[in-house]
UniProtKB/Swiss-Prot annotation:
<dbReference type="GO" id="GO:0006366">
    <property type="term" value="P:transcription by RNA polymerase II"/>
</dbReference>
<dbReference type="GO" id="GO:0060216">
    <property type="term" value="P:definitive hemopoiesis"/>
</dbReference>
<comment type="function">
    <text>Forms the heterodimeric complex core-binding factor (CBF) with RUNX family proteins (RUNX1, RUNX2, and RUNX3). RUNX members modulate the transcription of their target genes through recognizing the core consensus binding sequence 5'-TGTGGT-3', or very rarely, 5'-TGCGGT-3', within their regulatory regions via their runt domain, while CBFB is a non-DNA-binding regulatory subunit that allosterically enhances the sequence-specific DNA-binding capacity of RUNX.</text>
</comment>
<comment type="subunit">
    <text>Heterodimer with RUNX1, RUNX2 and RUNX3. Interacts with COPRS. Found in a complex with PRMT5 and RUNX1.</text>
</comment>
<keyword id="KW-0160">Chromosomal rearrangement</keyword>
<protein>
    <recommendedName>
        <fullName>Core-binding factor subunit beta</fullName>
    </recommendedName>
</protein>
<comment type="similarity">
    <text>Belongs to the CBF-beta family.</text>
</comment>
<dbReference type="GO" id="GO:0045944">
    <property type="term" value="P:positive regulation of transcription by RNA polymerase II"/>
</dbReference>
<dbReference type="GO" id="GO:0030099">
    <property type="term" value="P:myeloid cell differentiation"/>
</dbReference>
<dbReference type="GO" id="GO:0006357">
    <property type="term" value="P:regulation of transcription by RNA polymerase II"/>
</dbReference>
<comment type="function">
    <text>(Microbial infection) Following infection, hijacked by the HIV-1 Vif protein, leading to the formation a cullin-5-RING E3 ubiquitin-protein ligase complex (ECS complex) that catalyzes ubiquitination and degradation of APOBEC3F and APOBEC3G. The complex can also ubiquitinate APOBEC3H to some extent. Association with HIV-1 Vif protein also inhibits the transcription coactivator activity of CBFB/CBF-beta.</text>
</comment>
<keyword id="KW-0539">Nucleus</keyword>
<comment type="subunit">
    <text>(Microbial infection) Interacts with HIV-1 Vif; forming an active cullin-5-RING E3 ubiquitin-protein ligase complex (ECS complex).</text>
</comment>
<dbReference type="GO" id="GO:0016513">
    <property type="term" value="C:core-binding factor complex"/>
</dbReference>
<dbReference type="InterPro" id="IPR036552">
    <property type="entry name" value="CBF_bsu_sf"/>
</dbReference>
<dbReference type="GO" id="GO:0000209">
    <property type="term" value="P:protein polyubiquitination"/>
</dbReference>
<keyword id="KW-0597">Phosphoprotein</keyword>
């Protein structure tokens, strides 16, 4: 089953959902809302160091659970995200984040920053051309494999039917009955 839609770029550029989120807009950290602010700050920083966080686009209410690792990372082993994905050093009091993902069948990268005190900031989605091409190639391979297997099945089925028809004809010839084909 393909993980992406056939024309990802078109969907990203034309769908209202993506158009809204591709403009830089206000975001907020949404984790542990029931906890005191100081605890939320500490939990947010720890989550970033672990390579994950929950954010929301304020204007649309869209919530995302982000992972700050390269798209190829499978999560088999625990690792710390690189500075490319979680940058606590670029600007004092802020963390810059990057999270690749497939969202609604489209390869995107969420990019943004969050103020470490207020736990809000700015972020947006960008189309991930490189990953889109990789996923398109995988989808095409899966399609071709399914087509090949269907052809093989149809060939085996046709061969089996022909073999059965020959056997039935031979059996009828031995018993002396005539066969009428529909």
């Amino acid at each position: 089953m393909p993980r992406v839609v056939p024309d990802q770029r078109s969907k990203f550029e034309n769908e209202e959902f993506f158009r809204k989120l591709s403009r830089e807009c206000e975001i907020k950290y949404t984790g542990f809302r029931d906890r005191p602010h100081e605890e939320r700050q500490a939990r947010f920083q720890n989550a970033c160091r672990d390579g994950r966080s929950e954010i929301a686009f304020v204007a649309t209410g869209t919530n995302l659970s982000l992972q700050f690792f390269p798209a190829s990372w499978q999560g088999e082993q625990r690792q710390t995200p690189s500075r490319e994905y979680v940058d606590l050093e670029r600007e004092a009091g802020k963390v810059y984040l990057k999270a690749p993902m497939i969202l609604n069948g489209v390869c995107v990268i969420w990019k943004g920053w969050i103020d470490l005190q207020r736990l809000d900031g700015m972020g947006c989605l960008e189309f991930d051309e490189e990953r889109a091409q990789q996923e398109d190639a995988l989808a095409q391979q899966a399609f071709e494999e399914a087509r090949r297997r269907t052809r093989e099945f149809e060939d085996r089925d046709r061969s089996h039917r022909e073999e059965m028809e020959v056997r039935v004809s031979q059996l009828l010839a031995v018993t002396g009955k005539k066969t009428t084909r529909p």
